[in-house]
């Protein structure tokens, strides 16, 4: 696996940014197709380096021959902020186009996935469901549609400035309804959380919402397992998500 720290200018954010990339490399003389790609989002208080530093991601990705892109979203909740950057637009639209220009990544929907932990799990649901024709599968680890807690509530004003997200492309319940209407073309969703996680009630509310659509359009998997909100649980959840996503190495 090649590990890269990629710096470039983001037009959406109006500033220089960095992301981490893991890309499988070819053996001598081997010609490989453009790579299946996972966009992997960090949680509140973490950064674009956290997945590499705190999990066994590289080993898991190598086993599945999967490229992984890890952007930085600060504490944005993957939102186009009223008093800050347009992180939703950056990660939903600009980042995939830039990465495919820089790296040998597949442009096919069936080869493109998004997942995240905590705030990143919320972001993966938000972006994956708002762009259902772009992602074949979504992984939500230790999160739900609403992740508000007392320590993050003060950021709501910076993120939205009182702006209502209802009926916008950042309205996750509305995106769920639109994606569900696609039927078999909707993204698959894998959702897991620890039984001692402080966001468990949010995850269960999200489970109930996703399960309310007839016909299981998301081929939805929901799992509660022993564990708290942290990297020890997240590492195992990442391994399980990738096994669900791609049972056999490519």
Predicted regions and their residues:
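Non-catalytic cap/lid and distal C-terminal segments of serine-dependent acyl enzymes
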Residues: 1-250
